[in-house]
Amino acid sequence: MAQHNLGYINLLRGNIAEALQEMYEARPLAGTTPIALAVCDTDRAEALRDAGITREAERLLASVAPVFGRHRMPQSRAEVEFQLARSQLTHDPVTAARTAATASRRFRALGAETWAIRADGIRLRARLSRRSPRSADQAEVERVASALADSGFANESTALRLSLDIWRSGRGMPHPAPVTRVPPTASIDVRLLGYEARAARAAAAGRDAVARRQSASGLDQLTAWQQAFGSLDLQTSVRMHAGGLMVAGLTAAARSGRADVLFEWSERGRHLSHQVVPVRPPEDPQLAADLAELRQRMSGDQTGRWRLDPHFAELEERARERQWSATRGGGIRRRATLREVQARLDDGTALLSFVYTGTELAVIVVTGARARVVPLPGWAAAAKLLPGLRADLDMAASIRTGPMADVVRRSLDDRLASLSSALLDKAVRVPGAERFVLTVPGILEGTPWAMLPALRGRTFTVAVSATRWSAFDRDVSVGGRVGIAVGPRVARGEEEADAVAAAWAGHSPEQLRGTDATVDAVTALAGRVDLLHVAAHGRHAVDNPLFSGFEMADGALFGYDLDRVPEVPEVVVLSSCEAGRSSVRWGEEAVGMTRVWMHAGTRAVVAAPVIVADDAACDLLGAMHAGLAAGLGVSEALARASTETGILAPFQVYGSGF
């Protein structure tokens, strides 16, 4: 257990990556009995929760609770419920309050009053959440906070008092005392709560500039703590800790009405999870072996029963944790200012930066000469159209003939027109603008921008952030070494590969087809070419986006496999269903195969966020490659191909398409 305990010490110190690594390595040695294994997994769940990976943490806690129950260990079972409530507090305060209340009752039945008070603290913090329909009794909050402090739990006492402070500010209530002092030994989440409490007080007093400064200071502290995380998985997950500060800063920025202020805060949010420069991990034979076994199990059982196999879950978990610990941070990328971004915009280019405060949506329209904020009051009605959009798109791709095709198409056209009107009609009215850079919040993730009437046939790119877009050279021609890979069972896949190869005939493209298109061969090819085209069936894993991928001859090529590519291509074209889909984490971060490629260094990815008909993909992308080979940029080639072929499809460019 010594190595496991070292991991727990790292957890208490806030060294999450080190804690996860130590606990992972110690698990086979420390978990010699079911009880010992359950104790180890409870601690690991706490580390996962602090890293923002709450779903896995809660799944782990749910699996260990029955172990303590079977062995008649009610105290340990109640402690698991306490940890479960702590995790739920970050995203589901109603459930957290119930879980904490159950734990508190169990502790009191055992005579464990101190533990019961700790559970009461979580229950009250859940009630003080802005998302809770019930509020907490302030007198009880003070009583429990004092009891926690008297019992030596200063961190938890401070967190409870700060939560009450934020709750009072949100309701415009007076404060009887200054903001609770945060101890220097406080955990990162409590330190951030301190900044949020001061920002909330300032906002309630109408001092928005102070609210923004406090929020920014807290986010800077989070950045300093985040530097060790090179893994995309961890970088996007720790955004959990930034939620309150981002809402406070963005809301205060929106109230200013100033484009420069709102732009700064929109970039803060987008830049947060990709500001750490990842150091590519060294070759890991064990990780490669685990991924290969996962592939084999998945491809060998088409029924999906492999998902129920505990060994599969163990392999998946082990692969994730090896990647977390192996990928380190290599410094912080500086966030671009509005003036720096404007200097990169020529007369024909405009940036449309969509900003969501949690209640309102606006777009900052930026050109080289000016920036203005355009409110989008029609957003509330348009938002109701999003839930059914994916179903309409999927049906339109699947039902292309017969009497139902017209019905489906009309429903989709109406939905797209309404979204376009609400989101873009005012924003694209930029004199002289012929191409657009879009940056979007998580609430708009999955929008098929290329199909919205305001952008049909127009040149645009969906960037991770304005900072990342501006870091790349403009209008770089695509070419050099070209690679093509075709997965199994793709209708017109061979024809599509022929069209791509014909477009690049002068470059002698390297091709992998049939049984030659294995995962190892494709990852090796990716490391040799400047442009990679993959025609394969895609798969998006909602629970674990880095296990998304596409099917090759011997199984799925996962997002994790890209760590095996020493130098990724400049441009990647993913002609596969769902390859452009993403999962949204903590309201902002979108993670999927497109993001994995860009995190690894790819400049532009062409993909679709929804199902695409095979014939549309073949014809449209074949025409796009002809444009690329003729010297057009990625976004322009795709837009021109859509106009020339008359094909309206959800393919769009992510990253820097021009």
What does each of the following model-derived ranges do?
Residues M1-L6, A30-R44, G69-Q83, R108-R123, ...:
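Alpha-solenoid helical repeat architecture
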Residues Y24-G31, A62-M73, A101-A112, E142-D150, ...:
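Amphipathic alpha-helical segments of tetratricopeptide repeats
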Residues G14, G52, H91-D92, R131, ...:
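Residue-level detector of the short coil/turn that links helix A to helix B
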Residues E142, S146, G172-V182, I188-E196, ...:
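Amphipathic alpha-helical protein-protein interaction segments
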